[in-house]
Regions:
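Bacterial N-terminal signal peptides that target proteins for export
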Residues: 1-9
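C-terminal motif of bacterial Sec signal peptides marking the signal peptidase cleavage site
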Residues: 17-21
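N-terminal capping/linker segments that flank leucine-rich repeat
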Residues: 22-84, 93, 123, 134-135, ...
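Conserved hydrophobic beta-strand positions in leucine-rich repeat
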Residues: 68-72, 94-96, 115-119, 149-151, ...
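Canonical leucine-rich repeat
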Residues: 70, 80-85, 104-110, 127-130, ...
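Conserved "Asn-ladder"/turn position within leucine-rich repeats
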Residues: 75, 99, 122, 154-157, ...
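Leucine-rich repeat
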Residues: 87-90, 109-113, 133-137, 144-147, ...
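Ankyrin-repeat and related helical/solenoid repeat scaffolds used for protein-protein interactions
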Residues: 100-102, 107-155, 348, 353-430
């Protein structure tokens, strides 16, 4: 009997120890499967009371598990670190306002679980990874790549047509409920829509005469509407009073962004060079439906040419851009047989902050006209990828190094002409450029194939 009692006692003790062991396992701290490797993000999260082990894995305590929204506004956290927020098991909403993001925001940097996003106070014009879209039977059809139930946008986003418009219309077509709002001109949020204002009444009247089908009144267009049959392929061109009787009265070309930035319109060009007024525009993102973009005396906040794969004519002046990357355009990168009425032209002058110009390195190297004038911050330019031209103007008073074309032929009237024909190309330079050794070597080598001239508004050095 005593032995039996001892057995019962030992069994009870073992059972209690077993329960204690189970309780101990349940109380062991739990950590995220993946670590936060970005030190900046970890510092921010620690300051908010979240805890991490020595390997960067987050403690999944009540605070972490109950976090469904996270305020990272004003932290300027790198977007590359945002993927690591997947350590939060129940996080759905992010406030990223006032973080200095832009001009492009990469939606793919977000964890897929994020369905609410506040981007107010950022300078975002473009999105990567939000939608893919194409035109089918005059309708824009979109595939949404990242679903949102809440999306708050900065005012700069009103110039985005390629991503936000199809995201909005596709959600509307599928009857999805999305709290989609955008900051208006007064600085407050309002429900997103596809109506956009052309504020200058004379410019609006000019555009309405060309594209009446997308105007909802005298000064507003609907960026989701397709162009009428007769409007497709219509160019925006303002250079002379003969083109528009009220051209002198236009004080602003704001709103032209909605045309330049609409990749769903058929091929056309935008050319505004009536130089009596200084204009300004916001973000420009021409895609492969724009063959020419000419904006003379026009300040430009942002210009993205990364997808301007059909652009062969670019003319700019009086803006504050610091770099121009032409490597994805057709400028000096177009086969002669494919030259169109707009030619192959690059003109840039009176842009005080321009420091760098990039040309396609392995292109066909043919330009009809290339003009670089009054670019005081441009110290070096490499034109070695150019092999044929009709006119070349280099008026760079602060230039320290000009790498000249490997000049092989003269471009003339749609043909490439051998030097033996006696035809010559125009070569105009400023005195400072003439004094560069590379210029003197270029002249010495090709003098008989070149003739002296100056572009309108600039006085050149008579090197010949």
């Amino acid at each position: 009997m005593k032995i039996f009692k001892n057995f019962i006692g030992l069994a009870a003790l073992a059972l209690c120890l077993g329960f204690a062991s189970c309780d101990s396992d349940d109380d062991a701290p739990s950590y995220s499967n993946v670590a936060v490797s970005n030190s900046e993000l970890m510092t921010i999260l620690k300051a908010k009371g979240y805890q991490f082990d020595e390997n960067g894995k987050m403690l999944l305590d009540d605070k972490a598990n109950s976090t469904t929204s996270l305020d990272l506004s004003g932290t300027k956290v790198d977007t590359a670190a945002l993927k690591e927020l997947s350590v939060f098991p129940n996080l759905k909403e992010l406030n990223l306002s006032g973080n200095g993001y832009g001009p492009v925001f990469h939606i793919a940097s977000l964890p897929s679980q994020i369905t609410g996003l506040d981007l107010q106070g950022n300078g975002i014009y473009d999105f990567d990874g939000l939608v893919t879209a194409k035109v089918e039977n005059d309708e824009v059809k979109a595939t949404i790549l990242h679903e949102f139930t809440k999306l708050y946008l900065p005012a700069s986003c009103k110039y985005n047509v390629e991503d936000l418009m199809p995201f909005y219309t596709q959600n509307e077509a599928e009857n999805k409920t999305v709290d989609m709002q955008m900051v208006n001109d007064k600085g407050s949020l309002e429900k997103y829509n596809t109506l956009r204002e052309i504020p200058d009444t004379y410019f609006a009247a000019y555009l309405k005469n060309l594209f009446a089908s997308i105007f909802v009144d005298d000064t507003h267009i609907d960026i989701s509407k397709p162009l009428g049959i007769l409007e497709k392929g219509t160019n925006i061109s303002l250079w002379a009073p003969l083109q528009y009787e009220d051209i002198d009265k236009i004080q602003s070309i704001r709103g032209v962004e909605y045309f330049v930035n609409n990749p769903f319109y058929e091929d056309f060009f935008v050319s505004i060079g009536y130089g009596k007024t200084n204009f300004d525009v916001k973000g420009l993102m021409p895609r492969n439906n724009i063959s020419q973009l000419s904006l003379i005396n026009t300040a430009i906040d942002y210009l993205d040419l990364s997808q301007s794969t059909k652009m062969s004519n670019l003319q700019l002046s009086n803006n504050d851009l610091e770099t121009l990357d032409l490597s994805n355009t057709l400028i000096a990168n177009q086969k002669l047989d494919n030259f169109t009425d707009v030619g192959n032209i690059f003109v840039c002058y009176s842009c005080k902050n321009l420091k760098e110009i990039k040309f396609h390195k392995d292109g066909d190297g043919i330009v009809s006209k290339l003009q670089l004038c009054d670019l005081p911050s441009l110290k070096k330019v490499d034109l070695s990828s150019i092999h044929a031209f009709a006119s070349l103007y280099v008026f760079l008073d602060n230039a320290e190094d000009v790498i000249y074309p490997n000049f092989e032929k003269v471009y003339r009237n749609g043909e490439l002409v051998d030097f033996s024909s006696g035809r010559t190309a125009i070569f105009g330079i400023s005195e400072n450029v003439y004094n560069l050794n590379s210029t003197k070597e270029f002249i010495q080598k090709y003098s008989s194939n070149l003739r002296n001239s100056s572009p309108t508004g600039f006085k050149g050095y008579k090197w010949k």
